[in-house]
Amino acid sequence: MIFLKTDEEIELMREANRLVGMTQGELAKHIRPGITTLSLNKIAEEFIRDNGAIPSFLGYNGFPYTLCISVNEQVVHGFPSDYILKDGDVISVDCGTEKNGFCGDSAYTFCVGEVAEDVKALLRATKESLYKGIEKAIEGNRVGDIGDAVQTYCEKRGYSVVRELVGHGIGRKMHEAPEVPNYGKRGTGPLLKKGMCIAIEPMINMGSKNVVFESDGWTVRTRDRKPSAHFEHSVAITSNGPTILTIL
């Protein structure tokens, strides 16, 4: 079932999502060569709790960390660890909070030091495709319009769209209906209505679209071990168009 939110509920969601954006901003101050991804997880958990919220990923279906941190060829759901970031890495940070009974969710892929130009181009295209998808998140469109916009933008530039993982509705639960794929056909899928809140999150690979799941049961990486990028915003569909909730 798709739950439509009232204006008041969307304002409460904005608080949880704004904190996610603030957390990403705090992490950006620390992402550099020489820091471990586990240290970033600790920084995020303390920041979220200090701001009166709960890290919503921690314990979700048994996930053991506050952040999903995925480095280079890892696509999503990577575990923070003792891995020390080095110059040239790219790191996807997926962060969720719960505040006032509502969830926030956002992801951003950061460059660590000097990154190869072709990898930076992948990150730019993935981020731009997110906004192409958001442009289609308007009342009267369908979920397929979002996926088509993301897929078309990325594939025209020679990148591939991960199929196994998709965006989702968001509200009192981290994952609600509907699923929001990053691929699709215009005019298909669930109808977008005022009050829907969805997380749009392109996961785009430099090489093949194919992925594999690591032995930890969570981490997803590209099969060909080429880099991947991941950007995400939580968005409310309003009578005035899409409203990005995770933006500062």
Question: Predicted segment positions?
Answer:
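Active-site neighborhoods and metal-handling regions in enzymes and metal-associated proteins
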Residues: M1-L248
